[in-house]
Design a protein with these regions (language model features):
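Residues that define the transmembrane beta-barrel architecture of outer-membrane proteins
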Residues: 20-22, 48-54, 93-99, 112, ...
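Cleavable N-terminal export/targeting peptides
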Residues: 1-21, 198-212
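Extracellular loop and loop/strand-boundary signature of outer-membrane beta-barrel proteins
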Residues: 41-46, 85-90, 132-138, 176-182
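Predominantly the C-terminal beta-signal and adjacent terminal strand-loop region
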Residues: 71-73, 143-146, 151-212
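Short glycine/proline- and aromatic-enriched beta-strand/turn motifs that initiate or cap beta-hairpins
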Residues: 18-61, 195-197, 212
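Outer-envelope beta-barrel architecture signal
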Residues: 20-24, 66-70, 110-116, 142, ...
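Gram-negative (and chloroplast) outer-membrane scaffold detector with strong preference
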Residues: 30, 36, 59-131, 156
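Membrane-embedded beta-strand positions of outer-membrane beta-barrel proteins
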Residues: 24-28, 56, 72-74, 101, ...
Length: 212
């Protein structure tokens, strides 16, 4: 009896952990990014032109509730801007590694699952190649941004699930700080992904049931 209880106590945490993780996946996509230069003296806001880049991530989806999930991911992203002036254009290009966490609110339909995503991103500056005369210093190593997005996942009988997502991501704290200048990033992202469900497909509360 003691051996049975000990075995049960050993297995339960692993079983609970396996049930907690619902799926794992990858995404790839494109990013359109720009920056806002906010000067203090004189008070002035200058919005810069867009640059285009690449993004990719590995993600995990946790919990198996019908309407609410938690998504956590590690993402590589390219941001920056083009600073156009009378004397010429200055490119600012930055590469980030981000830890993203989203609340995912979903609703299953017959052939696909629409959902919305919202949550914080912790952005780590990997590299910077900036040439704006007013911002020649180093960007912050870490800063926060907020992601708001929407997506759709195709329903299939396989454990492999295709999905597509779009995000709007503004900074909630400056990515660059100097005595007379703060810079924030903003970007729009489009991406596609492939997710592998760790558990067998099951009927949700919205799956139609046919009775003869």
């Amino acid at each position: 009896m003691k051996k049975a209880i000990l075995c049960l106590l050993t297995v339960l945490p692993f079983t609970a952990g396996a049930q907690f993780f619902n799926g794992i996946g990858i995404t790839v996509g494109a990013t359109a990014a720009n920056q806002k230069f906010m000067y203090r003296d004189p008070a002035l806001v200058s919005k810069k032109n867009y640059v285009f880049g690449f993004n990719a991530s590995v993600m995990a989806e946790m919990t198996s509730y019908d309407y609410v999930r938690w998504v956590s991911e590690i993402q590589f992203n390219q941001k920056g801007s083009v600073d156009k002036r009378e004397e010429g254009s200055y490119a600012n290009r930055l590469q980030y590694l981000s830890w993203n966490n989203y609340l995912k609110i979903r609703y299953e339909l017959y052939s696909f699952i629409p959902y919305v995503l919202v949550g914080p991103r912790l952005d780590y500056t990997l590299t910077q190649a900036t040439s704006s005369p007013d911002a020649l210093g180093s960007y912050q190593p870490l800063h926060l941004s907020l992601a708001v997005g929407a997506g759709a996942e195709l329903i299939s009988y396989s454990r492999w699930k295709l999905f597509a997502e779009a995000f709007y991501v503004p900074d909630v704290m400056p990515a660059y700080t100097a005595p007379n200048l703060h810079i924030t990033n903003k970007d729009f992202e489009l991406r596609v992904g492939l997710k592998y469900n760790l558990h067998e497909n099951r009927e949700s509360c919205n799956t139609p049931v046919y009775v003869e």
